[in-house]
C-alpha cells in the first residue's frame, strides 16, 4: 500500500534575533524570570517578512533537499494562525511565490497542533492517490498577534517556518500513524479574536483586540495531560514500546510542560528534542522547525522512529509516528 515519505526538510527564521535582555527595555521582566519559567532564551521577530515569506524560504530549502522543482508539487497545505490575509489563503500566496502552478493549496488552523493535522491530511491524500508530492508547511508571524505590554504572553512567542516534502512510496517508511483530536468546549483557554460584528444594522459598535489571550494555568493542565495520552496512544495503536522510539519531538511551548511529561512517563530525557530556548513558541512552526533542525544537524537519521506530539488552541492535540 502507498505511504507518504518525508524526503525534504527546510526551516527559516527572520534575521532579527531578540534575546531576553532586549525585552527588559520595555517590559518589567528579566532574562532569569523568563528562563526559569519557560526555558526560553531568545526568539526571532520579523520586521518586514510576512508568514508567506517565511513559508516560501523554508519550502525552497525543503524542495532543494528533496531534489524536486516547485512544479513537481501537486499539493500545498499550510498550517498557521497568523495568515497574511483572511483571503486569499497564505498557501495560495506561497503557491504563487514558489511557482508551484500544478499544486492545489489551502490553509488549516489547528494552532500549535497544525503541523500534525497537516501531516494527517497530506498522508491521506497521498495514500488515496489524490496527490503524489505534497509540501507540508508550518509558518507563523506570531509577533503581530502579541500584546507587547503583557509580559506574561509576549515573552513566549517567536516567528518562523518549517517545511517538509512528502512523496508517495511503497517502502516501509514514512508516516506510519497520525492521531488528532479536538475539544471546542474549552476553546476560550487560548484565543485570538476575529473581526467584530459592526454592520450599520447593529446597535452599538464592538471593539476587538486581536491579541493572543491565554489562560496559562488551564493550558498547562491541558498540555501535560494530552501530551502524555497522545504518546501512550500512538505506542499502543502501533503495538510498539518506548524503547523502539529514537526521538520524541514535542510542540516547543514550555520546558516545564516537557519535563513534567518526561517525569510522568519515565522516558529518558535525552529522547526529547527541544530547541525552544533558541526560538520560543512558534506555534504551528515549532514541530517542523525542531524536526528540520535535528535532521539537518545529523541528530536524526534514516530508519529512525520518531513521535511528534502537539497541543494547542481549539483545543486541539495529536501525535504522529514517523519512520525516516
Curated annotation (Swiss-Prot):
Pathway connected to this protein: Lipid metabolism; fatty acid biosynthesis
A GO BP entry: fatty acid biosynthetic process
Enzyme Commission designation: 2.3.1.180
Keywords attached to this entry: Acyltransferase, Cytoplasm, Fatty acid biosynthesis, Fatty acid metabolism, Lipid biosynthesis, Lipid metabolism, Multifunctional enzyme, Transferase
Pfam families according to UniProt: ACP_syn_III (PF08545), ACP_syn_III_C (PF08541)
Catalyzed chemical reaction(s): malonyl-[ACP] + acetyl-CoA + H(+) = 3-oxobutanoyl-[ACP] + CO2 + CoA
Gene Ontology CC entries for this record: cytoplasm
Cytoplasm in keyword set: yes
Region annotated ACP-binding, chain positions: 252-256
Subcellular location field: Cytoplasm
GO MF entry, a single one: beta-ketoacyl-acyl-carrier-protein synthase III activity
Principal subcellular localization: cytoplasm
Top-level division of the source organism's lineage: Bacteria
Active site, per annotation: 112, 251, 281
Role played: Catalyzes the condensation reaction of fatty acid synthesis by the addition to an acyl acceptor of two carbons from malonyl-ACP. Catalyzes the first condensation reaction which initiates fatty acid synthesis and may therefore play a role in governing the total rate of fatty acid production. Possesses both acetoacetyl-ACP synthase and acetyl transacylase activities. Its substrate specificity determines the biosynthesis of branched-chain and/or straight-chain of fatty acids.
PANTHER family: 3-OXOACYL-[ACYL-CARRIER-PROTEIN] SYNTHASE (PTHR43091), BETA-KETOACYL-[ACYL-CARRIER-PROTEIN] SYNTHASE III, CHLOROPLASTIC (PTHR43091:SF1)
Annotated domain remarks: The last Arg residue of the ACP-binding site is essential for the weak association between ACP/AcpP and FabH.
Entry's family note: Belongs to the thiolase-like superfamily. FabH family.
Subunit structure: Homodimer.
Alphabetized HAMAP family for the sequence: FabH (MF_01815)
Name of the protein this chain belongs to: Beta-ketoacyl-[acyl-carrier-protein] synthase III
Taxonomic placement: Bacteria, Bacillati, Bacillota, Clostridia, Eubacteriales
Amino acid at each position: 500500500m502507498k505511504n507518504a515519505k518525508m524526503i525534504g526538510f527546510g526551516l527559516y527564521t527572520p534575521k532579527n534575533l531578540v534575546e531576553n535582555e532586549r525585552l527588559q527595555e520595555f517590559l518589567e521582566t528579566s532574562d532569569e524570570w523568563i528562563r526559569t519559567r519557560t526555558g526560553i532564551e531568545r526568539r526571532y521577530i520579523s520586521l518586514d517578512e510576512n508568514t508567506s515569506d517565511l513559508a516560501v524560504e523554508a519550502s525552497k530549502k525543503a524542495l532543494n533537499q528533496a531534489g524536486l522543482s516547485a512544479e513537481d508539487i501537486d499539493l500545498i497545505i499550510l498550517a498557521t494562525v497568523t495568515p497574511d490575509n483572511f483571503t486569499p489563503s497564505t498557501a495560495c500566496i506561497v503557491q504563487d511565490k514558489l511557482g508551484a502552478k500544478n499544486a492545489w493549496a489551502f490553509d488549516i488552523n489547528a494552532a500549535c497542533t497544525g503541523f500534525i493535522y497537516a501531516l494527517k491530511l497530506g498522508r491521506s491524500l497521498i495514500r488515496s492517490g489524490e496527490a503524489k508530492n505534497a509540501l507540508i508547511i508550518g509558518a507563523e508571524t506570531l509577533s503581530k498577534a502579541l500584546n507587547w505590554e503583557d509580559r506574561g504572553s509576549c515573552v513566549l512567542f517567536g516567528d518562523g517556518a518549517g517545511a517538509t516534502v512528502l512523496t508517495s512510496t511503497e517502502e516501509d517508511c514514512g508516516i506510519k500513524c497520525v492521531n488528532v483530536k479536538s475539544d471546542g468546549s474549552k476553546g476560550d483557554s487560548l484565543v485570538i479574536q476575529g473581526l467584530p460584528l459592526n454592520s450599520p444594522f447593529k446597535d452599538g459598535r464592538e471593539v476587538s483586540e486581536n491579541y493572543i489571550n491565554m489562560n496559562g494555568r488551564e493550558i498547562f493542565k491541558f498540555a501535560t495531560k494530552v501530551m502524555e495520552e497522545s504518546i501512550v496512544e500512538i505506542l499502543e495503536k502501533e503495538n510498539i514500546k518506548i524503547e523502539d522510539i529514537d526521538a520524541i519531538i514535542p510542540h516547543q511551548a514550555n520546558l516545564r510542560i516537557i519535563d513534567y511529561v518526561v517525569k510522568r512517563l519515565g522516558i529518558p530525557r535525552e529522547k526529547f528534542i527541544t530547541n525552544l530556548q533558541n526560538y520560543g513558541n512558534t506555534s504551528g512552526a515549532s514541530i517542523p522547525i525542531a524536526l528540520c533542525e535535528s535532521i539537518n544537524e545529523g541528530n536524526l537519521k534514516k530508519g529512525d522512529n520518531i513521535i511528534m506530539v502537539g497541543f494547542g488552541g481549539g483545543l486541539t492535540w495529536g501525535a504522529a509516528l514517523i519512520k525516516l
